[in-house]
């Protein structure tokens, strides 16, 4: 009877301890204590603790009664060595009595599974792929800039050559114009225009006289300033360059040859009209009346060009 009462008190103490500590602590404590024996005829009651459900967690624990002694006396413990504990039976009964944990708690307490390699951070996957694209873009920009710089260099070189050619032509033109010492291109071109106009007036003045013949006096053609004042003819500016002094042929005069022999006459002489470059080509390009005039009197053109 005393053994039964001690076992009841022990179970009641385990129950209180189980309610305060939990199932895991009770199982660990019972496994460590190997001096209690529970008969196989009396099954252990199912103990429910804080892990069995959420309703018992909120209910307060009943206070212990003052007449109940939770500590085991020495006389009660003296009978424990005569009854060896079957530890496998006690542990199996306690493990069987514990309810299975809720699946939600196991899911919540379980560590998160490792992420697959496909769900790696964005930078670790995109960075290697974007590197060749960035490199290709930089190469394309570099090639485009090189092409633009090369095109600019070619354009500058062409402009430099064109300016050099223009300067050379302007120098040549300045040498052809007499008394032209202008430095600017505009003033030099003005002198060229005036010189060409004066040459045109000289040709218009002397060509009719040569076409009619040398035995007739030249027709009187007033200067542009006089013709403009008289109201006859177009208004031309006065020529800046003097007209060539050409002596007309007088048939009343008799030209006598000197009796002294000229030693230079026997030597071969150069044709004075050979200075005209492209003289025959120029005659072929002119109309027939001018070709006849220039073939008979090419000296006028020679004098006008030299002046």
UniProtKB/Swiss-Prot annotation:
GO terms for molecular function: DNA binding; protein dimerization activity. Residues 110-119 have a biased composition (Pro residues). PROSITE patterns: BHLH. Signal peptide: none annotated. Residues 41-68, 101-155 are annotated as: Disordered. Its main location: nucleus. CDD domains: bHLH_AtPIF_like. GO terms for cellular component: nucleus. This is Transcription factor bHLH127. The gene is BHLH127.
């Amino acid at each position: 009877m005393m053994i039964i009462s001690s076992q009841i008190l022990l179970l009641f103490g385990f129950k209180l301890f189980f309610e305060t500590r939990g199932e895991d602590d009770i199982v660990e404590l019972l496994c460590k204590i190997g001096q209690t024996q529970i008969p196989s005829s009396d099954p252990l009651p199912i103990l429910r603790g804080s892990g069995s459900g959420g309703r018992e967690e909120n209910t307060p624990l009943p206070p212990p009664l003052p007449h109940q002694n939770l500590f085991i006396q020495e006389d009660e413990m003296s009978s424990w060595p005569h009854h060896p504990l079957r530890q496998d039976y006690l542990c199996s009964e306690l493990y069987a009595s514990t309810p299975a944990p809720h699946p939600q708690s196991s899911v919540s307490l379980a560590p998160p599974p490792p992420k697959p390699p496909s769900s790696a951070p964005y930078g670790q996957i995109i960075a290697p792929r974007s590197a060749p694209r960035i490199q290709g873009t930089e190469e394309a920009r570099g090639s485009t800039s090189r092409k633009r710089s090369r095109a600019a260099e070619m354009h500058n070189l062409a402009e430099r050559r064109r300016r050099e050619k223009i300067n050379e032509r302007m120098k040549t033109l300045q040498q052809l114009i007499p008394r032209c010492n202008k430095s600017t291109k505009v003033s030099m071109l003005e002198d060229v225009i005036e010189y060409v106009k004066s040459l045109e007036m000289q040709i218009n003045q002397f060509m009719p006289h040569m076409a009619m013949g040398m035995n007739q006096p030249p027709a009187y053609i007033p200067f542009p300033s006089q013709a403009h004042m008289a109201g006859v003819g177009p208004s031309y500016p006065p020529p800046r360059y003097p007209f060539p002094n050409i002596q007309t042929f007088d048939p009343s005069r008799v030209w006598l040859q000197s009796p002294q022999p000229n030693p230079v006459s026997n030597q071969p002489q150069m044709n004075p009209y050979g200075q005209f470059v492209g003289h025959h080509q120029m005659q072929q390009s002119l109309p027939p009346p001018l070709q006849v005039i220039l073939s008979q009197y090419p000296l006028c053109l020679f004098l006008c060009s030299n002046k």
